[in-house]
From Swiss-Prot:
Species per Swiss-Prot/TrEMBL record: Clostridium acetobutylicum (strain ATCC 824 / DSM 792 / JCM 1419 / IAM 19013 / LMG 5710 / NBRC 13948 / NRRL B-527 / VKM B-1787 / 2291 / W)
Gene3D superfamilies documented for this protein: 1.10.8.60, ClpX chaperone, C4-type zinc finger domain, P-loop containing nucleotide triphosphate hydrolases
CDD domains hit by this protein: RecA-like_ClpX (cd19497)
PROSITE patterns: CLPX_ZB
Cross-referenced Pfam families: AAA_2, ClpB_D2-small, zf-C4_ClpX
SUPFAM superfamilies listed in its UniProt record: Glucocorticoid receptor-like (DNA-binding domain), P-loop containing nucleoside triphosphate hydrolases
HAMAP family, per the entry: ClpX
The protein's assembly and partners: Component of the ClpX-ClpP complex. Forms a hexameric ring that, in the presence of ATP, binds to fourteen ClpP subunits assembled into a disk-like structure with a central cavity, resembling the structure of eukaryotic proteasomes.
Record's protein name: ATP-dependent Clp protease ATP-binding subunit ClpX
Transmembrane regions: none
Recorded family membership: Belongs to the ClpX chaperone family.
Amino acid sequence: MAKYDNKKQLRCSFCGKSQDQVKRLIAGPGVYICDECIELCSEIIADEFEETPQINVGSLPKPSEIKDYLDQYVVGQEDAKKSLSVAVYNHYKRINSNLSNNDDIELQKSNILLLGPTGCGKTFLAQTLAKFLNVPFAIADATTLTEAGYVGEDVENILLKLIQNADYDVERAEKGIIYIDEIDKIARKSENPSITRDVSGEGVQQALLKILEGTVASVPPQGGRKHPHQEFIQINTTNILFICGGAFDGVDKIIENRTRVSTIGFGASIQSKQQKDIGAILKKIMPGDLLKFGLIPEFIGRLPIIVTLNSLDQGALVKVLSEPKNALVKQYEKLLQMDNVELEFKDGALKAIASEAISRSTGARGLRAIVEDIMKDIMFDIPSREDVKKVIVTENTINTKQPELVLEEGAKAIEAPKKKEKSKTKKDIESA
């Protein structure tokens, strides 16, 4: 409401200054605002919407520089790292070209499909890439997605995660990277069209088509279905790089059936699963194999770059444990270093851990669980012992959970408590 003093003089509705105290007083329906308050409001709005530094795609590192950075964190997978480095470099070159060039030639987007067994580094590769490029990055799980109108997440929620990670800066989010994990789980359940609606398989593939290709999508800022009257955020997905990853368990059999020369009888060679090199088989993959697996042709067409990853052998897993900048062994060394204790893993111990991960078929992802199990008792006892200088984990420690301890000079060795022998029963004496 308009404010008046005793002499009926007009006053600013915001700061309360009278008409005589300001240069200008602007009237609205029942309210007044002075020039000083207008200037203050203008400054507040300018600070609120101050432009954030944009991604300088012009100064993007070269493919060799991208690969060198990936080498510091990711062990092996040389072909995959090369392919990803080139694909990402070309993607941001394309953005730069389309923004600055008025040429008739418009460069089209090339999304990426990563294939490889579980625990081979698909997700980690995408995370490391986004960290190096300093662009907004989001990871989505394809298993939670359903068609619009059914229980589950809409495909637009993937874009919402990217916008949130860009602090709701839509322009910055439009140059980000989205990694969709478990993409093989939305494959069609059968090769033939079904009479029942496949809302979490083919239906999701159909819903993802326009987003992958490039469209202006309407994203609900509060997550969609529970708030139907909210205002939508408009985001253009044309310059968003989509990387889809999946294990595609069983596609190797489809490839083998296509490439193998069929032999039957005594001359037929039979290979066990352990003898097969899954990585070598996946390198022969063709779009037709993905079609048989359950991806629809339109979806395959929007993922033109197919990158295959090899399963990690014992040697590679040993390197994963010790070589990268954030290697698992280095993490535990740092944890014990905080207790002023040195930690050392012998080569035999690292090989035994790698062998256990292979037997569990968990790849690099399962290494932490194995090491955590070995280190549990060590990390429980060491903080309360001031006489221990160094802990050595050997191959024998993997089974016994008892490491070799190097004590401070002058400290007395403390033996581990021995298990009490069970008293012999009458039956044991008679059998003896």
